[in-house]
Amino acid sequence: MAPKSDKAPNLVGAIDEGTSSARFLVFSSQTSRMISSHQIPIDKICPKEGWVEQDGEVIMDAVWECLEETAIKLKEDNELEVNCLSAIGISNQRETTLAWDKKTGKPLHNAIVWLDMRTASTMDTLLGKVPDRDKNCLKNLCGLPISPYFSALKIRWLLDNVDAVKEALEDGTLLVGTMDSWLIWNLTGGPNGGIHITDVTNASRTMLMNLKTLQWDNELCKFFDIPKELLPEIKTSSEVYGRIAEGPMEGIPIASCMGDQHAALLGQKCLKKGSAKSTYGTGCFLLYNTGSEIVDSEHGLVTTVGYKLGPNNDVAYALEGSVAVAGAAFAWLKENIGLVETVTEIEPLANRVHHSGDVYFVPAFSGLYAPYWQSDARGVICGITEETQRSHIVRAAMEAICFQTRDILEAMAKDCGTPLYKLQVDGGMTANNLLMQLQADLCGIPVIRPHMAETSALGAAIAAGVAGGVDVWDINDIQAPANDIFRPRVTEFERNNRYLKWKMAVERSFGWEI
């Protein structure tokens, strides 16, 4: 890579590898404005009911293509060279797990996506080992309940069920990791010197990292029978890990790595204890910054690492509530039952009616996450009458996202002793004005939407820009993004009455099996 001119702007790139797409975005370190980007959709593979996979090589190819295409766009649209990039950060879908051979560089099985439910039987076997089948028995170490959601069960399933994984383990060539590890290993050389690392935010979603030591825990690894040598080295969220090994961005340092929801916390400037954000994408994820305190939830939330910006800085912890199905419910309306032809029809269709007609939709397609943690829950639609129209069901699907967010907000208020007085939001779905208004109405607090909704990528870029040796950003100088505010418009009585019926519908979803 050619040296950068003294007059060239300092730009920071961010790889945003999500459930539905891979992207590369470039931001100005002076203004935080996005300069250029490229995006490629990523398909999910569903070989059996409850199974959700993605092809690791397809994801990696998409990331390389995004880097190449953005380099071209920078040149053609902005007359900028890639040597203006000071560093690259990574924001990735969490919990999704891959096993690969370090000699060949090839995946040994498709990546098991966070939504996947195949490990329900693995969970059942593990719970048989603990007193009273207590799924919270490890929370004092890792902050998480035993659930198919988290990576340890996915790794255990791969070790138990995939012959190629077993053979690589015997041969000493097996590596496992979440998607950040797969990306960084390939970007830094793959079989030819690739670095096998992860960061504290991604590691905190595996059930294998000790929240206090921020290292792989011997007791946890023993419980799941996962050899520690298979796992990546844990780093902070902001430091130079290595450099891009090839392509138009060869030599540019990779200087941050964060799970997408943690990156959004940073991108929203939720840096103070008590601040929170909710990201709306395939799922919905609400994180509450608890500062240096590890808060043990008694109301169905999980304790996780918020971020750690460099080896010499303190770790910030968070409480999190995760909703499995948010945007995925809209995709289901389109692809599975044909209620709409395009997702863009959903908002105008829901606006045709002023209420859901007392219809309640619980989209528990793969169980319910926080605060219920019911892996045997399945989707239900309640309250249908002969008057029910397509618009009512679509609006009920929209309201389901908002009700699930309220479930989490109420749990957070109980755990922290103080209710949130506002909700900062981000993610692609926040462009839906009706969804944002319903969220304000059903939670009873203002909803704050930034004009630049893709804050996960911005957070990864910020973490890269403040890394030691990069230092093109001062985190204290970064302004919170301009925003729109949605304020509640319904009475407290109406809000609480509808929420009571939602809780009734949720109870009806429990107890179903695949």
Task: Give the location of each predicted region.
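Active-site core segments that coordinate phosphate-bearing ligands/cofactors
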Residues: 2-7, 13-15, 26, 127-198, ...
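A structural motif corresponding to the C-terminal end of an alpha-helix
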Residues: 223-230
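Short secondary-structure junction motifs
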Residues: 21, 82-85, 229, 356, ...
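Structural motif
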Residues: 77-80, 226, 415
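Carbohydrate-associated surface elements
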Residues: 116
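Flexible loop residues that form catalytic
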Residues: 93, 239, 428
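Hydrophobic or amphipathic alpha-helical targeting/insertion segments
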Residues: 104-107, 113, 125-131, 137
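N-terminal glycine/serine-rich phosphate-binding loop of ATP-dependent small-molecule kinases
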Residues: 1-109, 121, 140, 233-236, ...
